[in-house]
């Protein structure tokens, strides 16, 4: 699964808007949009935040 698909899957599973997920991760709404559209691969630090957030919510 591509990173963009993982972001959208996690967001939908948690019933979050793009804005709400952005707030949870400390990134901008535009960043979440780019990630989901597969326009940009996030930096390692941002990927780590995303995966840690998912793990804390029970999403693997």
Predicted features by range, described:
Residues 1, 11-13, 27:
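Short amphipathic helical patch at the helix-1/turn junction of helix-turn-helix
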Residues 5-20:
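Short basic helix-loop element that most often maps to the first helix and adjoining turn
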Residues 8, 33-34, 51:
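Key DNA-contacting residues within the recognition helix of helix-turn-helix
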Residues 10, 24, 35:
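Residues in the recognition helix of alpha-helical DNA-binding motifs
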Residues 16, 27, 59:
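Short glycine/serine/threonine/alanine-rich loop segments
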Residues 27-42:
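Recognition helix of helix-turn-helix/homeodomain-like DNA-binding domains
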Residues 43-60:
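DNA major-groove recognition helix of helix-turn-helix/homeodomain DNA-binding modules
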């Amino acid at each position: 699964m591509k990173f963009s698909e993982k972001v959208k899957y996690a967001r939908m599973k948690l019933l979050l808007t793009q804005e709400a997920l952005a707030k949870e991760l400390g990134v901008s709404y535009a960043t979440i949009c780019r990630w989901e559209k597969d326009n940009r691969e996030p930096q390692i630090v941002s990927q780590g935040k995303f995966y840690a957030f998912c793990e804390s919510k029970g999403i693997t």
